[in-house]
Amino acid sequence: MSFDIKWENLTVDNTINESIQSFLDEQFKKLSLPSYISNLSVTDFQLGEIPPEITIRHIGDPFDEFYEDTTDSPETEQPKEEYTGDDDDDDDDDEDDESDDDGPGLSTISEGIHLLNFNRTGSPLPDATPLSPRPMNRSRDSFQSILHPFGVNIGPTGSETPTNLLNQSYFSSRRVSIKQKQPLYDENDIQLIVEFNYKGNLHMNILVNLLVNYPSPNFISLPIKLHITDIEIHSIATIAYLKKAVFLSFLCDVNDETIPEFNNSQSIEYYTKNNPIDIIKKIKIESEIGEVESNILRNVGKVERFLVEQLRNILREELAWPSWICLDMNDDDEEEEEEENPSESSSTTHVGS
């Protein structure tokens, strides 16, 4: 299955471009720069007009880690129950609780296929117990209603899902009781495992000062403008929608032959110890500089290699599992509410991982 993205809706104004530029600029400013570089800044970022190709491989419930990421908000905190003594009603409640614990946990749309058993902390997880699929009340129309506001339309069926991604031992989940998960779970929560293939015309500009430290420190400071283009990404990613927020993380390479079969704790431990994947598969960088001596040009090459490596590291640390980004859409609802009721509006800051 695949779907089309109205990419032009993302670039209708410059808000998203400016947000990404600000994020990258902040990340680069945190770097410890080598002695031959100073004043590094991201001056421009454009998503471009060419959208990525996205093919759906699997549809199911969001990873447990995403729910854990939302438990910090006050509305998700549940009051603690106090023991009031031996009472018949309490005994009945205990029996109901035990019944709930024995019930089915989270399942996926495809019977026998469960969620990836990933652990954000990188520690090995206990052996997963197969979950009985619960009745799904999401129809194709309801799925379409979730994606429609974001300009996403269901399209024709894509290529077949790789065998290793549909292996039951590969897709598994920790057992979560209905009693524990129900307060957090919503019927509109959904997660897509997708093949993300991007070969667009995204570009960004970086301005940096090249320093010549001979015959004395900072003897020459030469501004250089670098153009980064032709970025290619081809990986398996997860896109989850829950609590009016979208979670995005890249899981593994499309043709990653090193992924073990998840049939025992040893294979799970092997995977969780692996480093996050390198998201960028290809990148091109060009320097804009005047006539200079050959030794300065050699330093320009060092600057280019440094920036490319740091950009790869930033994306790997922020977007590759067990890390993810969260796009909080509650801000949009609050802005609309403020416009409708300006006298009753209040400012709230949302922070996502």
Swiss-Prot record:
- One GO CC annotation: ERMES complex
- Outline the segment boundaries, as ranges, of region: Disordered: 64-140, 330-353
Single GO term (MF): lipid binding
Pfam annotation, one family: MMM1
Keywords in alphabetical order? Endoplasmic reticulum, Lipid transport, Lipid-binding, Membrane, Mitochondrion, Mitochondrion outer membrane, Transport
Q: Which domain of life is it from?
A: Eukaryota
GO BP annotations listed: mitochondrial genome maintenance; mitochondrion-endoplasmic reticulum membrane tethering; phospholipid transport; protein insertion into mitochondrial outer membrane
Where's it mainly located? mitochondrion
Enumerate composition-biased segments (Acidic residues): 64-75, 84-103, 330-342
**Location of this chain's protein in the cell:** Mitochondrion outer membrane; Endoplasmic reticulum membrane
PANTHER family under this entry? MITOCHONDRIAL DISTRIBUTION AND MORPHOLOGY PROTEIN 12
- Domain notes, please? The SMP-LTD domain is a barrel-like domain that can bind various types of glycerophospholipids in its interior and mediate their transfer between two adjacent bilayers.
Which HAMAP family would you find in this protein's record?
A: Mdm12
Q: How does it assemble?
A: Component of the ER-mitochondria encounter structure (ERMES) or MDM complex, composed of MMM1, MDM10, MDM12 and MDM34. A MMM1 homodimer associates with one molecule of MDM12 on each side in a pairwise head-to-tail manner, and the SMP-LTD domains of MMM1 and MDM12 generate a continuous hydrophobic tunnel for phospholipid trafficking.
Please give the function described in this protein's UniProt entry.
Component of the ERMES/MDM complex, which serves as a molecular tether to connect the endoplasmic reticulum (ER) and mitochondria. Components of this complex are involved in the control of mitochondrial shape and protein biogenesis, and function in nonvesicular lipid trafficking between the ER and mitochondria. MDM12 is required for the interaction of the ER-resident membrane protein MMM1 and the outer mitochondrial membrane-resident beta-barrel protein MDM10.
In Swiss-Prot or TrEMBL terms, this protein is called: Mitochondrial distribution and morphology protein 12
Q: What is the lineage of its organism?
A: Eukaryota, Fungi, Dikarya, Ascomycota, Saccharomycotina
